[in-house]
Structures are given as C-alpha cells and as structure tokens.
Amino acid sequence: MLLGITAQGNNPDAAVDPRFGRCRYFWIVDTVSGQQEILENPNGQNSGGAGIQSAQLMVSKSVEAVLTGNIGPNASQVLTPAGIKIYTGITGKVTEVIDRFKSGDLKTV
C-alpha cells in the first residue's frame, strides 16, 4: 500500500507533523517494496488553500492512505472521493508509524 505521511523532517527519526496542509514534508512510503520518497511540501507557506492543494498532491502521487495528526474538512473532501483512507491522531516517529500501520494498530477516521 502506498502511504502519504506528514512529517516535521526529512530523516528517519522525524516526528509526524500534526498538520496536514501545512506540514513540512510528505513521506511517500510503499509498504510492500519499502521504497520511500520524501517531498518538501510546496503548499506549507500558502496563505490559503494549503489543505486542498496538499490533498491534490497526495491524489497525484496515487497514495492509498494518508497518516497525519489533524486534517481539515476541505482536504478530506478531496481525499475521500479519491478513495484515499485517512488516519488522524497519529503521533511518533515516521518509522514507528510505518511499523504500527503494517501491524494493523492504526484506525481510519
């Protein structure tokens, strides 16, 4: 499964960013192959529409699930129709969150 995880940094010990639209980085992780792509969020400094634009970025990257601390209703309205599962209330290091996802410990909204 292809995950989009919000992160505060671009290293394996980075914490999950509690913000979706204005997170610093997105980690795109393939849970099958283990491949990872780290993207600096181009929408983080936008004055408006960051959530929608970040959601559109996740759709364009073909992610199947988004893992974040919080997400706004506008971003959800982009992700949900695209069939992307949303996991909120996520905390901890990105690498730990990937392991928790793989073990089935996370619940969708």
Q: Which residues are covered by each model-predicted region?
A:
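Internal alpha/beta domain cores that form substrate/cofactor-binding pockets in large enzymes
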Residues: 29-32, 36-45, 77-86, 90
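Domain-level signature for proteins that mediate thiol-based redox and metal-cofactor handling
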Residues: 7, 12-14, 65, 80, ...
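Conserved SAM-binding loop
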Residues: 67-68, 86
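Compact, glycine-rich, soluble single-domain proteins
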Residues: 39-64
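N-terminal first-folded block
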Residues: 2-43
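C-terminal structural segments of small proteins and small subunits
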Residues: 73-109
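Short secondary-structure boundary segments
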Residues: 7-9, 69-70, 90-91
